[in-house]
Amino acid sequence: MHSRTNCLQTSVRAPQPHFRPFTAVKTCRQRCSTTAAAAKRDQAQEQQPWIQVGLGLAAAATAVAVGLGAAALPAQAVTSEQLLFLEAWRAVDRAYVDKSFNGQSWFKLRETYLKKEPMDRRAQTYDAIRKLLAVLDDPFTRFLEPSRLAALRRGTAGSVTGVGLEITYDGGSGKDVVVLTPAPGGPAEKAGARAGDVIVTVDGTAVKGLSLYDVSDLLQGEADSQVEVVLHAPGAPSNTRTLQLTRQKVTINPVTFTTCSNVAAAALPPGAAKQQLGYVRLATFNSNTTAAAQQAFTELSKQGVAGLVLDIRNNGGGLFPAGVNVARMLVDRGDLVLIADSQGIRDIYSADGNSIDSATPLVVLVNRGTASASEVLAGALKDSKRGLIAGERTFGKGLIQTVVDLSDGSGVAVTVARYQTPAGVDINKIGVSPDVQLDPEVLPTDLEGVCRVLGSDAAPRLFG
């Protein structure tokens, strides 16, 4: 998701590239920094957690003016339904990352669909748009009916009714739907769902081959209603588990933090003068994350803790700009993330020299549920040598989508680019490898529990 704003002027905030309708974004190879004033424009970007469909959206609610331009249209009169179809076609034409369009002639497809697909009613037009996008064979470039677009926006705002599962595809050819991350404290996490679990059925409906939006619809529902989810651990299809879950409406608290005192020597940085560690848990990147993280790092910096533990385990991403903002709080200079499309590197987001704490020893906890904007953050901290990455390899979700609003309230999520770390590593399907191998469950995620373990004989060696 990434649309950024005038690269030639000073700033654009970064995570989710900004929003200048992606369609209007021009190639920019110079480094761009961002200002706090740009923050609000970034807030509508990328996916979010409670049943957040794992899109990795970068501009989740970006309104893009999709003009028909000068492209030649059929000689016959164009109906209002066909105009809506053309809006969707043009959104992909302008922004899609693969300019070969999966080996198809995008212009020829437009003409073919206008001539052959019935578009007399809105439902038929929607169906024609879905068929057009299916040609791309890209599960993340999808049509969003008005209700689904509204649900996506609610997710990036921080609350949604569901069972607390963020879902995505497994990356293989089977189109299995897997748990990207269970939302902390959500019904699914409490029932034992884990990152990487394969979802088999939802209320008896087999989900393999369904779109993520269809599965999301099955999982969402009225607050306090029940839903049955059958799943299994990766590689163990014969060992299914059945979870009886109660849907809840929650507001996601993106940041929690504390100071752990009397920390065991094994968990401290070498030569630490204090037995204190600052622990910051980032559960998601939503519209509240930047301000909350700023408060956390500012307070811990004032305390002069011996080290920082940044926990982004099971953080499935969210607003790309928030991920970059957090990186800027910890890194004072250098590149943080590269945005690449079919033509190569198009944008570079860098530190802005206004970090809160760029010196305190830092370890970043990750696992297979660390994805998208969280991987951007982990990659930035690793490649800048700001901190050690501890845990297991992250998920590997590096595609960027932007959501283009259509005139009737529907939208199209379009894959527009991909993330790369400052060292040029393509995150997608690869992830970020840890510097320190660590059992991802060695530390709890609640504040009291993590301090208890860090102060015990079971404290892990975090800083190498």
UniProtKB/Swiss-Prot annotation:
GO MF, one example: serine-type endopeptidase activity
Catalytic residues (positions): 372 (charge relay system), 397 (charge relay system)
Reported consequences of knocking out the gene: The LF-1 strain contains a frameshift causing a premature stop codon within ctpA. This strain is unable to process the precursor form of D1.
Recorded name of the encoding gene: ctpA
Any one Gene Ontology cellular component term annotated for this protein: chloroplast thylakoid lumen
Record comment: activity regulation: Not inhibited by antipain, 4-amidinophenylmethanesulfonyl fluoride, aprotinin, chymostatin, 3,4-dichloroisocoumarin, diisopropyl fluorophosphate, E64, EDTA, EGTA, iodoacetamide, leupeptin, pepstatin, o-phenanthroline, N-ethylmaleimide, phosphoramidon or phenylmethylsulfonyl fluoride.
Protein name: C-terminal processing peptidase, chloroplastic
Catalytic EC class: hydrolase
Cellular localisation: Plastid, Chloroplast thylakoid lumen
Subunit structure: Monomer.
Residue interval of the organelle targeting sequence: 1-32, 33-77
Sorted UniProt keywords: Chloroplast, Hydrolase, Plastid, Protease, Serine protease, Thylakoid, Transit peptide
Family as reported in the entry's similarity comment: Belongs to the peptidase S41A family.
pH dependence: Optimum pH is 6.2.
All residue ranges annotated as the PDZ domain in the record: 149-234
PROSITE patterns: PDZ (PS50106)
Function: Protease involved in the C-terminal processing of the chloroplastic D1 protein of photosystem II. This proteolytic processing is necessary to allow the light-driven assembly of the tetranuclear manganese cluster, which is responsible for photosynthetic water oxidation.
EC nos: 3.4.21.102
A GO BP entry: proteolysis
